[in-house]
Amino acid sequence: MSRKFSMTPIAHIHSDFAEKFGVPRQSGLVEELEADIVFEPAYQNPDALRGLEDFSHIWLIWVFDRAIRDTWSPTVRPPRLGGNTRMGVFATRSPFRPNPIALSCVKLAGIRQTAEGPVLRVRGADLVNGTPILDIKPYIPYADNHPDALGGFAAVPAGETLSVSIPPALLAQVPAERQEALRGVLAQDPRPHYQKDPERVYGFSFAGFEVRFTVDGDQLTVRDIRPAE
């Protein structure tokens, strides 16, 4: 018998990304990125986190809340393959799934107590600001690490990172503690894989700023940084 399950978010993430564009394609690619996990009132009991401080990494189980559709397709076109080849949805990490659930492994940088309950500081997250978190589990090295694992069409990294050039006057607008994270995000090439026009200006929101850039070959040049409206 088929059963349905209703789940309630235990927390939401506070990250530097207001939109999907610019978010790293996988967790852990830009460890300089920091984000906070803030718990909902019903889950703010510090006892629920007892012992978590002894783990260096955690799993986040979350919802693709910006990609929910009424229907789903058994095949998708992974951007990694240029958007031209179809693969089975269960052989990909596409957000367009029967159940839009995601899994990210992030570094646990700290746990702090606040008047509103405990807050987790994490690094390397690939989530848009406000994304609902369904569950948190510790990463257990002996069980979760598989050196002999095969990676299918994603067996190797997506490619070389880009060389990033940001004029000092533009970079100075970004808080010092966000600058390396911004460089890391840009080096991962935020563009869709099928867009390679060197004249096109791309843009995304990061940490309260609008960032505009172009890419020519393996060189990314930031053209403008200004406060987001």
Region spans (language model):
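Mixed-charge, low-complexity intrinsically disordered regions
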Residues: 1-101, 113-121, 125-229
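Conserved positions in beta-strands of structured domains
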Residues: 106-109
